[in-house]
Amino acid sequence: MPHIDIKCFPRELDEQQKAALAADITDVIIRHLNSKDSSISIALQQIQPESWQAIWDAEIEPQMEALIKKPGYSM
């Protein structure tokens, strides 16, 4: 596996841009985790800014110690 779950504010990404993002992330995961391309899955969820607090409360703040890249902001 790994499964990567990207959450971000809405972006105007066309299918080509999404494919390029997925390819770049896949390359990094293969290089650093020695994964196979076929074992990697990537989700892209666009979250409205007014809903971000819920993501912070449920996923970011409780996992702060496990994050390998911590945000430069707090809520």
UniProtKB/Swiss-Prot annotation:
Give me the disulphide-bonded residues: none
Q: Where is the active site?
A: P2
Q: What class of enzyme is it?
A: isomerase
Report keywords, A-Z: Cytoplasm, Isomerase
Q: Does the keyword Cytoplasm apply?
A: yes
Major subcellular site: cytoplasm
Q: Where in the cell is it found?
A: Cytoplasm
GO cellular component, as recorded:
cytoplasm
Alphabetized GO MF terms: intramolecular oxidoreductase activity, interconverting keto- and enol-groups
Show the coiled coil region(s).
Answer: none
- Per the UniProt entry, the Enzyme Commission number(s) are 5.3.2.-
Q: How does it assemble?
A: Homodimer.
Instruction: Name the family the entry cites.
Output: Belongs to the 4-oxalocrotonate tautomerase family. PptA subfamily.
Q: Which NCBIfam families match?
A: PRK01271.1
Name of the protein: Tautomerase PptA
Taxonomic source organism: Shigella sonnei (strain Ss046)
